[in-house]
UniProtKB/Swiss-Prot annotation:
<feature type="modified residue" description="Phosphoserine">
    <location>
        <position position="747"/>
    </location>
</feature>
<keyword id="KW-0663">Pyridoxal phosphate</keyword>
<dbReference type="GO" id="GO:0030018">
    <property type="term" value="C:Z disc"/>
</dbReference>
<feature type="site" description="May be involved in allosteric control">
    <location>
        <position position="156"/>
    </location>
</feature>
<feature type="site" description="Involved in the association of subunits">
    <location>
        <position position="109"/>
    </location>
</feature>
<protein>
    <recommendedName>
        <fullName>Glycogen phosphorylase, muscle form</fullName>
        <ecNumber>2.4.1.1</ecNumber>
    </recommendedName>
</protein>
<dbReference type="InterPro" id="IPR011833">
    <property type="entry name" value="Glycg_phsphrylas"/>
</dbReference>
<feature type="binding site">
    <location>
        <begin position="310"/>
        <end position="319"/>
    </location>
    <ligand>
        <name>AMP</name>
    </ligand>
</feature>
<feature type="modified residue" description="N-acetylserine">
    <location>
        <position position="2"/>
    </location>
</feature>
<keyword id="KW-0328">Glycosyltransferase</keyword>
<keyword id="KW-0597">Phosphoprotein</keyword>
<feature type="modified residue" description="Phosphotyrosine">
    <location>
        <position position="227"/>
    </location>
</feature>
<feature type="site" description="Involved in the association of subunits">
    <location>
        <position position="143"/>
    </location>
</feature>
<feature type="modified residue" description="Phosphotyrosine">
    <location>
        <position position="473"/>
    </location>
</feature>
<dbReference type="GO" id="GO:0030170">
    <property type="term" value="F:pyridoxal phosphate binding"/>
</dbReference>
<dbReference type="InterPro" id="IPR035090">
    <property type="entry name" value="Pyridoxal_P_attach_site"/>
</dbReference>
<dbReference type="GO" id="GO:0005980">
    <property type="term" value="P:glycogen catabolic process"/>
</dbReference>
Length: 842
């Protein structure tokens, strides 16, 4: 029996997600039934909603495996250059819906589950996020995997299968509490363990110098077991692989010391080895020099390089070389991209393999290494740069330290030859930093050992060349490139905002989904009343849906007709959630001052996690919740102003809040946010941006036109000038009454009556040592926010500006980013050609 179709349901029949054929639906129902009984061993009397989710996941996965095997066979036959994306983080989120979107199965699965009396959306909500990342860097890696598959590149993501991903955030009494993220508790239907490809990784030991060369001996061995996850491209039958390594103790672990009777203890101690892949370090833009973290970094690199070389040697190309010891062709067959410095040990490890094991001479090995590796820089914050203590490396990786010293010696010889007599330049450029603690500067190692170095937005790449890597740019300018970040439009539009994807497809067709520049065609609809109405309607539906979600999950009631003002990202001083707080308090004080004056109602939502050891970030969360407690319970405010802290912000929550946002807050101090990618997601989903000229905001404003962007605040040059003059917060405090009032409220306990000095650390920081100059941008920010409210009063003009933003967001597809990496760094040509489906003849 079929349900009556609403207009919206009828429209789904012309969906961008592919039609549900009748055979398709009955086949899916049959497979669902089979998996429930034979894979999960449940019947409908005992099956839980989670069982139904797993049955659906296995049913969808069945459609992946044929394409996955086919793709790998295709790569073996054609032997293209392989791209290896090395990252300590892959922030994948959920997999079910993304797989259905990319395989055009969503409608059929929706219909099949409906016919079985189930709600697909409810089943999708059961899936755990794969939270193997902190924020932007890990999510970028995930978007890149999607684009590499969509562009038909023979690419592999390599990382660590953390047993515990980024912690779950609970807010208790306004404070962040962390809970372990046991995401594998119920199993993961998307991964396939590959124990047959387990590889040894060595630690500690010592170096023996023999007539044959150096030997690393007496090491401790940990095994790396790979788990493979399929990565489907968008409707091209390509399925690439993400391979994540899990640490396992070898069977003889601690037993070869055979201390009598120590058998039980030796088996219990296996945990120590297996701790390497236990947990993701929860630091974003902060370096913590812990031995376990260094072990993680070497673990992923050592296992991955063995795998890369095994695949190179057993390739069709490799097998034509009978002894397989010739690495001349290696850089033509292999590209290694280092996602930040975390996998930088790939450089000395590849050198160790080529020199110590494959017996290449140093110069040849170095040539191969440099031509193979490329490095992406993600931050200019000094506290985020990796600088490993020599004493740690000496103990853990003695041979690698020797190799780094040799690399450094030869590198500095080149510098000295290029800049004779410039001794200070040698000190600045050395890979080894002298000081109280001798350290290895991993960024310097990456630049020396790579043929390409890129920043992630135009302004960031310029800052690298002009400031932190200036010396290196002067030595080898040809190495430095820009690759502005992007986001995958599959997850960040089609999946999370089907209503908007549909409205767009009705005007310009569906091809934009894999060619986002086509959104420019929407510029001709900027005065089309029907389109304006449709875009506004979708936004309102998304806002209602998100309001219902907040009410259901968090029991908070919000006004869906208010302006949804959203700042979601990691909590960090440089991202300036505090500036947002100052605006909230300003609005509150204005309401209290003139309670009868009309004000555009706002719901201000802030979400994000603070690193567990980052005191100031945790205080910022407490401040946001404290402001909310005052504002949300003041009857004078009514529904004109609401402050919501979005607990446990993660990929799956981003997919809900971003489509509902009206205003996107991108307010970092100019020169601190390398790129940002949340900014792009909001732009694509029909929010307007208030932001500084920082990171990718600069290019977004350039694409949309500055008149369609709410730009405020100091530019990079202004910040530099202010630094030279000396930033003095007191000046702003004295000059701006509204600001002074806020600081007095924070100091006197207005927002913390039970503990009046609760926010003294925040006040002290803002007044005396604010590296990120919050007060310097306060006035312009408030004025700019007033302009936002003014425009919001005119819904038609607001929506026209939204359309201009959506139409010019095409540049920020990760497909464009990856096509540029492919052509300009990896030397491969992207392709949108489909592979034959598993049931098609090749």
């Amino acid at each position: 029996m079929s349900r009556p179709l609403s207009d919206q349901d009828k429209r789904k029949q012309i969906s961008v997600r592919g039609l549900a054929g009748v055979e398709n639906v009955s086949e899916l129902k049959k497979n669902f039934n089979r998996h429930l009984h034979f894979t999960l061993v449940k019947d409908r009397n005992v099956a839980t909603p989670r069982d139904y989710y797993f049955a659906l996941a296995h049913t969808v996965r069945d459609h992946l495996v044929g394409r996955w095997i086919r793709t790998q066979q295709h790569y073996y036959e054609k032997d293209p250059k392989r791209i290896y994306y090395l990252s300590l983080e892959f922030y994948m989120g959920r997999t079910l819906q993304n797989t259905m979107v990319n395989l055009a199965l969503e409608n059929a699965c929706d219909e099949a589950t409906y016919q079985l009396g189930l709600d697909m959306e409810e089943l999708e909500e059961i899936e755990e996020d794969a939270g193997l990342g902190n924020g932007g860097l890990g999510r970028l890696a995930a978007c890149f995997l999607d684009s590499m598959a969509t562009l038909g590149l023979a690419a592999y993501g390599y990382g660590i299968r953390y047993e515990f991903g980024i912690f779950n955030q609970k807010i208790c009494g306004g404070w962040q509490m962390e809970e372990a993220d046991d995401w594998l508790r119920y199993g993961n239907p998307w991964e396939k363990a590959r124990p047959e490809f387990t590889l040894p990784v060595h630690f500690y030991g010592r170096v023996e110098h023999t007539s044959q060369g150096a030997k690393w001996v007496d090491t401790q061995v940990v095994l790396a077991m790979p788990y493979d996850t399929p990565v489907p491209g968008y409707r091209n039958n390509v399925v690439n692989t993400m391979r994540l390594w899990s640490a396992k103790a070898p069977n003889d672990f601690n037993l070869k010391d055979f201390n009598v009777g120590g058998y039980i203890q030796a088996v219990l101690d296996r945990n120590l080895a297996e701790n390497i892949s236990r947990v993701l370090y929860p630091n974003d833009n902060f370096f913590e020099g812990k031995e376990l973290r260094l072990k993680q970094e070497y673990f992923v690199v050592a296992a991955t390089l063995q795998d890369i070389i095994r695949r190179f040697k057993s390739s069709k190309f490799g097998s034509r070389d009978p002894v397989r010891t010739n690495f001349d062709a290696f850089p033509d067959k292999v590209a290694i991209q280092l996602n930040d410095t975390h996998p930088s040990l790939a450089i000395p490890e590849l050198m160790r393999i080529l020199v110590d094991l494959e017996r290449l001479d140093w110069d040849k090995a170095w040539d191969v290494t440099v031509k193979t590796c490329a490095y992406t820089n993600h931050t200019v914050l000094p506290e985020a740069l990796e600088r490993w203590p020599v004493h740690l490396m000496e103990t853990l990786l003695p041979r690698h330290l020797q190799i780094i010293y040799e690399i450094n010696q030869r590198f500095l010889n080149r510098v000295a030859a290029a800049f004779p007599g410039d001794v200070d330049r040698l000190r600045r450029m050395s890979l080894v930093e002298e000081g109280a603690v001798k350290r290895i500067n991993m960024a310097h190692l990456c630049i020396a050992g790579s043929h390409a170095v890129n920043g992630v937005a135009r302004i960031h790449s310029e800052i690298l060349k002009k400031t932190i890597f200036k010396d290196f740019y002067e030595l080898e300018p040809h190495k430095f490139q820009n690759k502005t970040n992007g986001i995958t439009p599959r997850r960040w539009l089609v999946l999370c905002n089907p209503g908007l994807a549909e409205v767009i497809a009705e005007r310009i067709g569906e091809d934009y989904i894999s060619d986002l520049d086509q959104l420019r065609k929407l510029l001709s609809y900027v005065d089309d009343e029907a389109f304006i109405r449709d875009v506004a309607k979708v936004k309102q539906e998304n806002k209602l849906k998100f309001s219902a979600y907040l009410e259901r999950e968090y029991k908070v009631h919000i006004n869906p007709n208010s302006l949804f003002d959203v700042q979601v990202k990691r909590i960090h001083e440089y991202k300036r959630q505090l500036l947002n707080c100052l605006h909230i308090i300003t609005l509150y004080n204005r309401i209290k001052r003139e309670p009868n004056r009309f004000m555009v109602p706002r719901t201000i939502m802030i979400g994000g996690k603070a690193a567990p050891g980052y005191h100031m970030a945790k205080m910022i969360i407490k401040l946001i919740t404290a402001i909310g407690d005052v504002v949300n319970h003041d009857p004078a405010v009514g529904d004109r102003l609401r402050v919501i802290f979005l607990e446990n912000y993660r990929v799956s929550l981003a997919e809900k809040v971003i489509p509902a946002a009206d205003l996107s807050e991108q307010i970092s101090t100019a020169g601190t946010e390398a790129s940002g990618t949340g900014n792009m997601k909001f732009m694509l989903n029909g929010a307007l941006t208030i932001g500084t000229m920082d990171g990718a905001n600069v290019e977004m404003a350039e694409e949309a036109g500055e008149e369609n962007f709410f730009i405020f605040g100091m530019r990079v040059e202004d910040v530099e000038r202010l630094d030279q003059r000396g930033y003095n917060a007191q000046e702003y405090y004295d000059r701006i009454p509204e600001l002074r009032q806020i600081i007095e409220q924070l100091s006197s306990g207005f927002f913390s009556p039970k503990q009046p000095d609760l926010f003294k650390d925040i006040v002290n920081m803002l007044m005396h040592h604010d590296r990120f100059k919050v007060f310097a941008d306060y006035e312009e920010y408030i004025k700019c926010q007033d302009k936002v409210s003014e425009l919001y009063k005119n819904p038609r003009e607001w929506t026209r500006m939204v359309i201009r933003n959506i139409a010019t967001s095409g540049k920020f597809s990760s497909d464009r980013t990856i096509a540029q990496y492919a052509r300009e760094i990896w030397g491969v040509e992207p392709s949108r050609q489909r592979l034959p489906a598993p049931d098609e003849k090749i």
